[in-house]
Amino acid sequence: MPRFHVSHRKDGKFERRGLRSYFEYRDLGIKRVTGGKVVAHVIRARPGSAPHGEWHYHDCAVQFVYVLRGWVLFEYEGVGRVMMKAGSCFYQPPRIRHRELKHSKNLEMIEVVAPASFKTFAATPAARKSPARRSPG
């Protein structure tokens, strides 16, 4: 059974280890206390780095992101381009093909994924042209 856990900002540190080289990640300790069932981390833009815009998908059951500050522009297969701003949250269905197009220098977001260990695969969307879609807000 998971135990109670707290992670304070002042005690955490950002590391350049993670899925994307253009981000820094601060582990929130959730993977350890859930025995690998869930991972949660704060992600922020790495200074001087930009996204590659590569299409990919994640083999996971749940992926949820909440934008703390800044903005990020994604493109999803079958959905189109979606701009996320501070206060936006999104759930990505399992294996949805997507890519990040760009983000602000001050981007910071929380990501929660289950299971904690998941695979990411390069992908090409079946339909390259997706209708533009704007998120409210």
Question: What do the PLM-derived regions correspond to, one by one?
Answer:
Residues Y66, Y91, L101-K102:
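Well-ordered beta-strand positions
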Residues E77-V79, K102-H103:
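Conserved catalytic-core motifs of eukaryotic protein kinase domains, centered on the activation segment
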Residues M1-R16, R99-G137:
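Double-stranded beta-helix
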